[in-house]
């Protein structure tokens, strides 16, 4: 049987990526650059001959639009798209909407990095009546509890079981699956796929708009640990830019 493929695609640059704000579950749109990144992501899929048969994405427009733009560029606009909240970005709690550089200056490097990159320390909770709360957002009406904050461990807990149950079986059958999601939901997935430790995951940065392809064997194992970026040079530069967020 031919190996299946998982295509991990972080959404293109969003408005708050550009303004260096913590975004989380706030539903901001793509910038023009983000749209171009999504289009280029789809073109890279065509150039590599890696064409998805199904897409999984979040309930946030920056990921949904990235998927749609990439699929149009790859002439795969007709394939099924499944949207689920468990692919959402990590909820950044009371940090949502704050400028990253200003937050780092106010709280110091150590606290900033603990909130941003530690595995199991969430930021302070966001009040239900706060400006950027999702407590009354109709798209989350079926959730027993809408998150008020999350650490990366929380994202692993919500996303990985869904991946194991809904997405991985497709890849094990030889399908090619596009996962259009977010920096931290994809970090959670890569941690799982590559067995990255809780400490080492802090060093992993996912660039926007560049497909990362994992080959999956029939038994569900990863054939190419670490995955393969379809534009390695751009991916390295993009990851470095993500790591630098918070600096003026």
Swiss-Prot record:
<comment type="function">
    <text>Catalyzes the interconversion of 2-phosphoglycerate and 3-phosphoglycerate.</text>
</comment>
<keyword id="KW-0312">Gluconeogenesis</keyword>
<feature type="binding site">
    <location>
        <position position="100"/>
    </location>
    <ligand>
        <name>substrate</name>
    </ligand>
</feature>
<feature type="binding site">
    <location>
        <begin position="116"/>
        <end position="117"/>
    </location>
    <ligand>
        <name>substrate</name>
    </ligand>
</feature>
<feature type="site" description="Transition state stabilizer">
    <location>
        <position position="182"/>
    </location>
</feature>
<feature type="active site" description="Proton donor/acceptor">
    <location>
        <position position="89"/>
    </location>
</feature>
<comment type="similarity">
    <text>Belongs to the phosphoglycerate mutase family. BPG-dependent PGAM subfamily.</text>
</comment>
<dbReference type="GO" id="GO:0004619">
    <property type="term" value="F:phosphoglycerate mutase activity"/>
</dbReference>
<keyword id="KW-0413">Isomerase</keyword>
<feature type="binding site">
    <location>
        <begin position="89"/>
        <end position="92"/>
    </location>
    <ligand>
        <name>substrate</name>
    </ligand>
</feature>
<dbReference type="InterPro" id="IPR013078">
    <property type="entry name" value="His_Pase_superF_clade-1"/>
</dbReference>
<dbReference type="Pfam" id="PF00300">
    <property type="entry name" value="His_Phos_1"/>
</dbReference>
<dbReference type="InterPro" id="IPR001345">
    <property type="entry name" value="PG/BPGM_mutase_AS"/>
</dbReference>
<feature type="binding site">
    <location>
        <position position="62"/>
    </location>
    <ligand>
        <name>substrate</name>
    </ligand>
</feature>
<feature type="active site" description="Tele-phosphohistidine intermediate">
    <location>
        <position position="11"/>
    </location>
</feature>
<dbReference type="InterPro" id="IPR029033">
    <property type="entry name" value="His_PPase_superfam"/>
</dbReference>
<dbReference type="GO" id="GO:0006096">
    <property type="term" value="P:glycolytic process"/>
</dbReference>
<keyword id="KW-0324">Glycolysis</keyword>
<feature type="binding site">
    <location>
        <begin position="23"/>
        <end position="24"/>
    </location>
    <ligand>
        <name>substrate</name>
    </ligand>
</feature>
<dbReference type="GO" id="GO:0006094">
    <property type="term" value="P:gluconeogenesis"/>
</dbReference>
<protein>
    <recommendedName>
        <fullName>2,3-bisphosphoglycerate-dependent phosphoglycerate mutase</fullName>
        <ecNumber>5.4.2.11</ecNumber>
    </recommendedName>
</protein>
<feature type="binding site">
    <location>
        <begin position="10"/>
        <end position="17"/>
    </location>
    <ligand>
        <name>substrate</name>
    </ligand>
</feature>
<feature type="binding site">
    <location>
        <begin position="183"/>
        <end position="184"/>
    </location>
    <ligand>
        <name>substrate</name>
    </ligand>
</feature>
<comment type="pathway">
    <text>Carbohydrate degradation; glycolysis; pyruvate from D-glyceraldehyde 3-phosphate: step 3/5.</text>
</comment>
<dbReference type="InterPro" id="IPR005952">
    <property type="entry name" value="Phosphogly_mut1"/>
</dbReference>
